[in-house]
Amino acid sequence: MDEHRSATTHSPEISDSEGMIEAMGTPVDEGLAPRILTRPEHKLSRKDLSQEAIKVLYRLHRSGYSAYLVGGSVRDLLLGGRPKDFDIATNARPQEIRRLFRNSRVIGRRFRLVHVFFKGEIIEVATFRASPEPPETPDDWEEAEEEAAEEEAVADPPRPHIVEDVYGTPAEDARRRDFTINALFYNIADFSIIDHVGGIEDLERGIIRTIGDPDERFVEDPVRMMRALEYAARLGFEIDPQTAEAIDRQKALISEASTPRLTYELLECLRSGQATAIHKAWWKAGVFTRAYQDLPLDTDESVRVLEMVDAGVVAGRKFSDPSLIGGFFLPRFLVLAEEETDEKGRVNNVRLLDRLREMLEPAAASMHLSNQTVHLIHQGLFAVTKMRCAPERGHQVLKLARQGYFPVAWEFFVFAAAVGYITPEVHQSWKRALRKVGKQELTDQQRESAQERPRPHRRRRPRRRPR
Ligand code: ATP
Ligand code: MG
């Protein structure tokens, strides 16, 4: 793999003609030729792409730019799966992309990229980039968004954070990526797959391998270790021995990684439908406790909650961030609730609320959780203790069901029923009571997730991701 990292003569200016030569499969800046699979040699078909992704690829191509589908979508399509989202790389510069798509916005701080908005889907379009530097965090993005808006308002804007040499060639863009299987390009010009890093072979053999020296790549960005284990669990792949050994050597660095990005990876894991397997892999490799020091997750009940989340996601349910993160705290909270309940079943609310706050505070701070998320977890968990007995009166149900935190509380209630804190009879009586007061949507959601149905074509959530 090292040879693939050999330096290239970097040319920050990528002309359109270079793009077209690249599109024809001839590397212009490399001593090493990429491997190219022509259209009949692979099974990725245009009809597997979303209409929006096709639209963006073609508009770039017809405007004279090179345009590739890149990253996870190419990997997933070659494996016969459905991608979560479609990312595009091009030689067009952010302002040029912006001009081509009215429904777009420039984002990113040091490295600017463009989000093209469609109904329910965002296509991310990035100019080929040279630098392998760690992805940015949402905090950077927020500032950058303001800057970008100001720049657009000025004819010749000063761009203090943008350094031209962040842009690179397609080969450099492939090599700055994390794993070989994530660096394949699908070329809209001739429908070929371009592989600069040995990704096709690794995809065929089921191997997760860093691009370049694994120690260097993990030091550069420790979150990649979490990602390697996550992909292995999700795809049922093996981690290449050198990559695995480097994880073992470098895992201590994870506790210094950017917390918003770690929280983002956790939420991605929880929404993948394979949280149980990913968590197990993280736990076994000794990275979970380093990444999420303040999350209690050490009991069978916690694993049961993860299994329920997986079952829900596979059935097409959407969980909110507070219900996913709060799920980690539920088993320990239930122990606290037991401890604060006397033999007559009365709960010492003041003490329980205090202990709940003490339990959540460290994680709230170390994981950069928003006040709103913490509030919903706090209220939602506490509400479960109020639902331990069957509801007595309709207005009690309605009052609770009208609270903003109730959808989160209901998720926790269902988890609590699965781990035996709520009896099946009480569970059923709350379901009936909710239907009676016209709040059946929550219980219907559950019924739906009980039936296995094919996973819908998942569109990207319109929210920013740290990169
Ligand atoms: P998923 O199915 O989880 O979305 P993905 O491969 O699309 O998987 P993303 O997090 O969406 O993962 O990132 C898109 C692409 O960006 C990756 O495929 C990879 O090429 C590149 N990438 C993401 N994170 C990193 C990183 N930390 N270091 C280097 N490259 C990265
Ligand atoms: Mg993706």
Regions found by a protein language model. Name each.
Residues M1-R467:
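Catalytic cores of the polymerase beta-like nucleotidyltransferase superfamily
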